[in-house]
From Swiss-Prot:
It comes from the Eukaryota. May play a role in vesicular transport from endoplasmic reticulum to Golgi. GO terms for cellular component: cis-Golgi network membrane; cytosol; endoplasmic reticulum; TRAPP complex. The keyword Cell cycle does not apply. Pfam families: TRAPP (PF04051). It comes from Homo sapiens. This is Trafficking protein particle complex subunit 3-like protein.
Length: 181
């Protein structure tokens, strides 16, 4: 039996607290499995990248955003729509250079660290939320935008805010991706 054509797809929501606690358990297990913080950071980024490449389809289907014409429009959509949709927060945006390809997302509140007081002992270079960087990078790559995404500041490391830096490297050649006429 097939679904009626007019029926909207159902989206399953997971409890935010369950997700945050599960993520914390994942990071704790990775810290046990890997001795070096760099390996944990790389694994979290890789996981996030995989999530981002799939999440972008859901985002585009649910948000109905149009085509963006500048990097600043893209960053505003990420901050005001994507973060709000998936994490329930709206980070502030700053542009970091005159060529307008470097931006920062400043999170006053980071839901992923809601139940975390500090980084584990001896893990000072751990980027606990590196999953977010991978998600953003993966999603941008799926819409043909190469970007470098890193944490610039982290509350878990004593900074006053959490800041994610996004640098657009270059716009990919769109002619390659357009159908031939």
């Amino acid at each position: 039996m097939s679904r009626p054509a007019h029926r909207r797809p159902e989206y399953h929501k997971i409890n935010k607290d369950l997700f945050v606690l599960t993520y914390g358990a994942l990071v704790a297990q990775l810290c046990k499995d890997y001795e070096k913080d760099e390996d944990v950071n790389q694994y979290l980024d890789k996981m996030g990248y995989g999530i981002g490449t799939r999440l972008v389809e859901d985002f585009l289907a649910r948000s109905c955003v149009g085509r963006c014409h500048s990097y600043s429009e893209i960053i505003d959509i990420i901050a005001q729509v994507a973060f709000k949709m998936y994490l329930g927060i709206t980070p502030s945006v700053t542009c970091n250079n005159s060529s307008k390809n470097e931006f920062s997302l400043i999170l006053e509140k980071n839901p992923l660290v809601e139940f975390v007081e500090e980084l584990p002992a001896g893990r000072s270079s751990l980027c606990y939320c590196n999953l977010l960087c991978g998600i953003i990078r993966g999603a941008l790559e799926m819409v043909h935008l190469a970007a470098d995404v890193t944490f610039l500041q982290d509350r878990l490391k004593g900074d006053s805010v959490t800041e994610i830096g996004i640098t657009f490297l270059k716009k990919r050649d769109e002619k390659k991706y357009r159908g031939k006429k």
